């Protein structure tokens, strides 16, 4: 068949249309595929962007430098008191060994001030003069040495050799060890051995161990001393193999502030994370600020005036009574501590079974004037100040910043004395020098009389004639006899009565003016947890301390 030109053109048109249809279908399919691919790419791109954003957020919450990472793992605590060393056998420095989490004792006081096992598992009394202590088997010192009976024996022997206060309290005749047990034999019956082994001077140390600083011992606590600089502060690092579990933070910095007013500014500027010793005048503002947390406990720490019996005026009973009568305990506690303190009747708080029920103290300015007049202290030359035997009466008052409220109390007393015609001059001293001072009338002093739940150690040290803590040289033969009786008394009711009798004698003699009991408070940034106050006032840093 012969094809015509029209046939050829018709087929060409059909083929062309078919080709265009195929091409169009391909393009449509291609475009659809591209749309799907674009959707996939958009989804992938969106996911990637979200991931990057999340990574960016996560990164901003993490320390951006080694310095910031270190800071996140460091808790800095400011204190207004810092000893020259933390050897537990040196004076009262064991308080800081325990407070900083460096050292631990065989027993530990709970919140009810009852001794509980700590480094010890249990204690038994085979006879009246013997105590057998079984030790934990999983404790190591911060140099890796295991805590054995022999190590504990050496530590306790070192203690009674170096500390007269501890030796007098414990009355140890001999110490023997066997494996994980230690047997203590006493010279006389010792009814409160568990309590005394919870006293911070009883911190167990490795006598043969060498710490990074000669100012600190090798203890068993969660933190070990790396740097210790008197009058500045200390650096503590977590002990990797602490028996209670490694600490949650890597480092603790202790920073000393000689000026209590500066410690508040340091907390606000984040120079420190927490403070102990904040002026009570500043405490109220922190309670209202959600950026901070406060751990506050009713404690047994009191503020007092200790009268120096070496001073000839103070040695006069009526003059000393006049000094006591001029102290307005109610106003002092309300104005100085801003509601965080209560007036005291004696050295033990009313919550204690041992507390004195009633004091002979009374605030009475007119009575003070009358006492001075009767004792021959009179203003004979009209200058506004009293004389005795023709000589103007001038006394010296010590002042120091152990508490920011102390200087304020002394200044108030100076003014009160002036109003009754006694010239008083204030001399500022370091708290560490107070015990060695001899030329003064009275000094403020802050004490916890029964940090181990029983007041015997306090009476034996601070009240008994010649006691190592009796800085005012108070002496009463009857009180001494009762303290000696208290040392061996096993009946709790009789211990309570003896303690009240001793306080009544102190009170009657006006040997001390116990002004009031104040709460112990730690103020911290809200990021800090597990930094708690305790009624004893010496358990602060633990392995649970954390920082968010």
Q: Where are these predicted regions, by residue range?
A:
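Ligand/substrate-recognition segments at binding pockets and active sites
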Residues: 379-450
């Amino acid at each position: 068949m012969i094809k015509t030109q029209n046939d050829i053109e018709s087929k060409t048109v059909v083929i062309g249309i078919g080709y265009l249809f195929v091409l169009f279908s391909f393009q449509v399919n291609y475009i659809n595929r591209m749309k799907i691919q674009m959707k996939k790419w958009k989804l992938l791109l969106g996911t990637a962007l979200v991931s990057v954003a999340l990574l960016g957020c996560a990164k901003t919450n993490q320390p951006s430098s080694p310095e910031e990472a270190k800071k996140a793992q460091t808790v800095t605590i400011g204190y207004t008191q810092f000893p020259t060393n933390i050897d537990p056998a040196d004076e009262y420095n064991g308080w800081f060994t325990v407070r900083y989490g460096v050292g631990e004792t065989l027993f530990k006081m709970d919140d009810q001030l009852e001794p509980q096992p700590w480094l010890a598992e249990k204690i038994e009394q085979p006879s009246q003069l013997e105590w057998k202590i079984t030790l934990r088997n999983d404790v190591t010192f911060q140099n890796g040495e295991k805590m054995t009976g022999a190590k504990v024996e050496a530590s306790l022997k070192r203690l009674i050799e170096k500390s007269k206060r501890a030796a007098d309290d414990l009355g140890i005749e001999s110490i023997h060890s066997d494996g994980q047990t230690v047997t203590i034999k006493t010279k006389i019956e010792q009814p409160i051995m568990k309590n005394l082994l919870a006293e911070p001077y009883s911190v167990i140390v490795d006598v043969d161990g060498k710490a990074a600083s000669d100012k600190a011992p090798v203890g068993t606590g969660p933190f070990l001393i790396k740097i210790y600089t008197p009058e500045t502060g200390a650096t503590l690092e977590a002990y990797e193999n602490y028996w209670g579990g490694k600490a949650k933070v890597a480092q603790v910095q202790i920073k000393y502030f000689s000026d209590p007013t500066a410690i508040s500014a340091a907390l606000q500027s984040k120079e420190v994370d927490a403070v102990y010793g904040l002026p009570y005048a500043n405490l109220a503002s922190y309670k209202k600020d959600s950026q901070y947390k406060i751990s506050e406990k009713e404690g047994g720490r009191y503020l007092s005036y200790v009268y120096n019996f070496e001073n000839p005026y103070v040695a006069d009973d009526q003059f000393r009574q006049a000094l006591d009568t001029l102290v307005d305990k109610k106003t002092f506690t309300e104005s100085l501590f801003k509601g965080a303190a209560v007036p005291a009747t004696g050295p033990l708080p009313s919550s204690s079974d041992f507390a004195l029920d009633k004091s002979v103290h009374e605030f009475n300015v007119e009575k003070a004037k009358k006492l001075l007049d009767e004792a021959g202290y009179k203003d004979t030359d009209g200058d506004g100040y009293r004389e005795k035997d023709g000589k103007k009466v001038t006394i010296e008052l010590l002042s120091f910043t152990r508490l920011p409220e102390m200087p304020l109390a002394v200044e108030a007393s100076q003014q009160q004395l002036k109003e009754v015609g006694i010239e008083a001059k204030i001399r500022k001293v370091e708290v560490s020098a107070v015990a060695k001072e001899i030329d003064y009338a009275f000094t403020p002093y802050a004490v916890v009389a029964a940090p181990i739940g029983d007041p015997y150690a306090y009476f034996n040290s601070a009240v008994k004639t010649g006691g190592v803590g009796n800085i005012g040289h108070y002496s009463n033969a009857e009180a001494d006899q009762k303290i000696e009786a208290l040392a061996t008394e096993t009946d709790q009711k009789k211990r309570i009565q003896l303690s009240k009798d001793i306080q009544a004698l102190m009170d009657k003699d006006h040997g001390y003016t116990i002004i009031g009991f104040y709460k112990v408070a730690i103020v911290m940034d809200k990021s800090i947890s597990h930094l708690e106050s305790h009624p004893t006032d010496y358990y602060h840093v633990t392995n649970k301390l954390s920082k968010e």
